[in-house]
């Protein structure tokens, strides 16, 4: 039961960090390449 509580307390923290970094990455891409439907570096 203790392992389940540890998992349930770690998963929200990791998902918050993951989605926060993903949102930051998308914001920075949109800052350098505004309104890009296709990215020019591909």
From Swiss-Prot:
Keywords: Chloroplast, Membrane, Photosynthesis, Photosystem I, Plastid, Thylakoid, Transmembrane, Transmembrane helix. One of its GO terms (biological process) is photosynthesis. This is Photosystem I reaction center subunit IX. HAMAP family: PSI_PsaJ. It is found in: Plastid, Chloroplast thylakoid membrane. Gene3D superfamilies: Single helix bin. SUPFAM superfamilies: Subunit IX of photosystem I reaction centre, PsaJ (SSF81544). It is a single-pass membrane protein. One of its GO terms (cellular component) is photosystem I. The keyword Plastid applies. It comes from Gossypium hirsutum. The lineage of its organism: Eukaryota, Viridiplantae, Streptophyta, Embryophyta, Tracheophyta. May help in the organization of the PsaE and PsaF subunits.
